[in-house]
Amino acid sequence: MRYIGINVNTGKDVEGRLLKKIVEAIEDNCKDVEVKIYKDSIGLEKKETENLEVVIVLGGDGTILKASKYLAKYNVPILGINIGNLGFLTETESSNFIFSIRNYFKGKYYIEERNMVQCTTEYKGIKKEFHGLNDIVVTKGDVGKTAKYDLYIDGNFYTKLSSDGVIVSTSTGSTAYSLSAGGPIIYPTLDALCLTPICGHSLRIRSIVLNHKSIIKIISQSENVILTVDGEEINFLENVKEFLITSSPYKCKLIKLEGEHRDYYSILRNKLYL
């Protein structure tokens, strides 16, 4: 018996028509199969997820980002089928799903691993860990006030920063918030972390690309800080000042189909209007 998961963004496949067609395509290509359906990533956090050989994600990059933090933990690969705008992470378009499902079951694919980022902090005496595929963002909680941060890299003092916040992105996340804040584009499979200030008050402070083994410590001088992981606000953290950011021990595994893999540079050109 093969166990296949489907995670659908119900805001994009509102009536479930694509979901139904994909279930039918799976059953047409594999007779001894059980399909588990998840809506908006609910349930992916459960331990039974580790029994799935793959999760087909119906949605966009945001849907994959949300699912990845659960699936990476259980070492389950993702096959992304895009609904809506062109994305960096989805592998194929919804109009081509029959070909994609057929190729998967024929074994015509390979798995591309993407580094993830981890943030460790302590909140109310409890150690907390968060994992993201794109980025970890530390921003000020007090609107209108200047925030100051002390930045350390591998135990060495790097700089004292006055800014609206700090982004630590993976190579995958370099084309997201980090790019908007002036960071560089990094090829997504490179093992790297990128530290980018948000609206730094000095033009001398720029992004820095680091080895993926680097340990970044952010110490906030503000009492109220907002921690955001892959665009999802974790909490309004009162009296939390220290954040330790490293590469995550988990990897996001993306399925790339033979004969269908999209050229990264064409996606980059279309997304960024180059």
From Swiss-Prot:
Its EC number is 2.7.1.23. Its main location: cytoplasm. InterPro entries: ATP-NAD_kinase_N (IPR017438), ATP-NAD_kinase_PpnK-typ_C (IPR017437), NAD/diacylglycerol_kinase_sf (IPR016064), NADK (IPR002504). One of its GO terms (cellular component) is cytoplasm. It is found in: Cytoplasm. It is an enzyme of class 2 (transferase). GO terms for molecular function: ATP binding; metal ion binding; NAD binding; NAD+ kinase activity. It comes from the Bacteria. GO terms for biological process: NAD metabolic process; NADP biosynthetic process. NAD(+) binds at residues 61-62, 66, 134-135, 145, 164, 175-180. It catalyses: NAD(+) + ATP = ADP + NADP(+) + H(+). Keywords: ATP-binding, Cytoplasm, Kinase, NAD, NADP, Nucleotide-binding, Transferase. It holds the Pfam family NAD_kinase_C. Its cofactor is a divalent metal cation. Gene3D superfamilies: Probable inorganic polyphosphate/atp-NAD kinase, domain 1, Probable inorganic polyphosphate/atp-NAD kinase, domain 2. The active site is at 61 (proton acceptor). Belongs to the NAD kinase family. PANTHER family: NAD KINASE. Involved in the regulation of the intracellular balance of NAD and NADP, and is a key enzyme in the biosynthesis of NADP. Catalyzes specifically the phosphorylation on 2'-hydroxyl of the adenosine moiety of NAD to yield NADP. This is NAD kinase. It comes from Clostridium tetani (strain Massachusetts / E88). The gene is nadK.
